[in-house]
A protein has these predicted regions:
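Surface-exposed, flexible loop/turn segments at secondary-structure boundaries
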Residues: 69, 80-81, 129, 151-153
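Catalytic cores of nucleic-acid endonucleases
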Residues: 77-143
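Acidic-basic catalytic patches of nuclease active cores, encompassing PD-(D/E)XK
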Residues: 14-57, 64-66
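Active-site beta-strand-loop-beta-strand hairpin of nuclease catalytic cores
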Residues: 59-72, 76-78, 116
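Non-catalytic C-terminal interaction segments of nucleic acid-processing enzymes
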Residues: 19, 27, 37-38, 130-195
């Protein structure tokens, strides 16, 4: 079969798109973490610790930037998972009890814009689950949003607003986070060897 020049040009123009469609992948938290580490934070971070509680609250990825600031990234795989995040303790400052008229006490809670010691906060999720009405479900208007397309490429949909009052971490703290990062690495390596 001989193709005309026009048909050949058309075939060349559509080939990469057909190939890309065959590369559609399932977006998992592990894939999102890998893409964030290798593409977005590759040159902007000193340390990236998965599943870290160091800052006082759970972070799926805790990033220490080159200027010694913390970025907290939550990896979400469903809308329900994103909506539940608003209830996490890291988004609330709880103070003393307040007495009510009926004699019962309630705890005074104030919403926070950033988790404790965190400079920036992001939610990362597949683009397929994101709708613009989910902005109202975010625990903070300062949170950034990173969306992953069908091929697994991350794109910053909305930049995070920094907490200017968040302190830089000390070198000793950075060393402690590096130790945690290496412990996570060897834990994953052991799991990999046992499977």
């Amino acid at each position: 079969m001989v193709l005309s020049k026009g048909e050949l040009r058309l075939q060349r123009a559509t080939w990469p798109h057909k190939f890309a469609r065959s590369l559609l992948m399932t977006i998992t938290p592990e894939l999102m973490a890998h893409k964030l580490v290798t593409q977005i934070f590759r040159r902007k971070a000193i340390i990236i610790v998965p599943e870290c509680f160091w800052a006082g609250d759970e972070a799926d990825l805790l990033v220490v930037t080159n200027n010694m600031r913390l970025i907290d990234i939550e990896l979400k795989i469903s809308r329900a998972d994103l909506k539940r995040d608003r209830q996490k303790q890291k988004w609330w400052k709880t103070s003393s009890w307040i007495s009510t008229v009926d004699g019962k006490g309630v705890r005074n809670r104030a919403a926070l814009t950033h988790p404790n010691r965190v400079w920036k906060h992001y939610f990362a999720m597949p683009k397929a689950i994101w709708t613009d009405d989910l902005v109202n479900c975010l625990p903070s208007p300062a949170s950034g949003i990173i969306l992953f397309d069908e091929s697994g490429s991350p794109n910053i949909y909305r930049m995070s607003k920094p907490d200017t009052t968040s302190p830089k971490i000390k070198p000793e703290s950075c060393l402690e986070l590096a130790r945690l990062e290496h412990l996570r690495y060897w834990k994953l390596k052991l799991k990999e060897m046992n499977t």
